[in-house]
């Protein structure tokens, strides 16, 4: 078992006594790219929020590397979740802060680092997603696609072992969406040990990097397996997700991590 496997066992999640997810049994393998698919309202984002810790299970459990997060002492569960980076669907940048200040928030809120070290850490991840030249812009000066890429940079700044992306191409035009997909592909190449989970309604542009696919329908898991297994399915509902579209290849700019930031993060992860 990989230390960063994400497993659901008879998991039901909801609000109050109303279940949105019903009896989910699946494992998203560590160090791989998993895509959670399904139509609107099927529970994809609810499942992602549950991994982050924004909801408690009605029944069943969630395990990371075999550890049931909701049975662990709070401090231990928090240490595991600190290794998660999240790209939320809305991006949620603070309008009063510049782009680099927004990206640095996961560090500046928890680590005592000199301002120049923080800024360089922010510039490093902005460089990775092609936004270094816009570091001192404010969010209202950026396009929707640029804000999404900034959200990705912010998710990467704390050197996560698990990256969770909620509809990363939602609301983007086809060209910008293809570039975001290409960035995810580039990230998988550069960080092959990172567990990446992408919530989407379309597998098309992620086929080349999807190691595992989980399909939800009306709050239930109807498929969990590899892409070849999905391709071998005769279920029309499953096969609709295999429409392929071409996309340009993207690469991440070379941006080695600052050892001062890595050392501070390592200390924080252990507290």
Language model regions located:
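Conserved ABC ATPase signature
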Residues: 138-142, 146
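Conserved ABC ATPase "signature" region
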Residues: 67-68, 115-133
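Helix N-cap at the start of a conserved alpha-helix in ABC-type nucleotide-binding domains
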Residues: 174-176
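Helix-to-loop junction immediately C-terminal to a conserved catalytic motif
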Residues: 52
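Catalytic Walker B motif of ABC-type/P-loop ATPase nucleotide-binding domains
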Residues: 163-166
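Helical segment within the ABC ATPase nucleotide-binding domain
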Residues: 178-192
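Conserved catalytic motifs of ABC-family nucleotide-binding domains
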Residues: 159
């Amino acid at each position: 078992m990989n230390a960063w496997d994400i497993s659901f066992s008879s998991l039901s999640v909801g609000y109050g006594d109303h279940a949105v997810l019903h009896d989910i049994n699946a494992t998203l393998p560590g160090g791989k790219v998993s895509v959670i698919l399904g139509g609107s309202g099927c529970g994809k984002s609810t499942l992602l929020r549950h991994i982050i810790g924004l909801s408690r299970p009605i029944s069943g459990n969630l395990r990371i590397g075999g550890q049931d997060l909701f049975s662990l002492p709070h401090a231990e569960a928090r240490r595991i979740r600190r290794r998660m980076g999240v790209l939320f669907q809305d991006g949620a940048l603070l309008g009063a802060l510049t782009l680099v200040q927004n990206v640095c928030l996961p560090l500046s809120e928890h680590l005592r680092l000199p301002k120049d070290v923080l800024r360089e850490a922010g510039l490093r991840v902005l460089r990775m997603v092609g936004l270094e030249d816009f570091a001192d812009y404010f969010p209202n000066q950026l396009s929707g696609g640029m804000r999404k890429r900034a959200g990705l940079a912010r998710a990467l700044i704390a050197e996560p072992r698990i990256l969770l992306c909620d509809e990363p191409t939602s609301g983007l035009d086809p060209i910008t969406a293809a570039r975001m997909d290409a960035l995810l592909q580039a990230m998988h190449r550069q960080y092959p040990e990172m567990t990446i989970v992408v919530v989407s309604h379309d597998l098309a542009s992620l086929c080349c990097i999807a190691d595992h696919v989980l399909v939800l329908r009306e709050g239930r898991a109807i498929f969990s397996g590899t892409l070849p297994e999905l391709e071998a399915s005769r279920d029309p509902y499953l096969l609709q997700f295999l429409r392929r579209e071409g996309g340009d290849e993207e690469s991440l700019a070379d941006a080695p991590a600052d050892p001062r930031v890595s050392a501070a993060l390592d200390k924080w992860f252990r507290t």
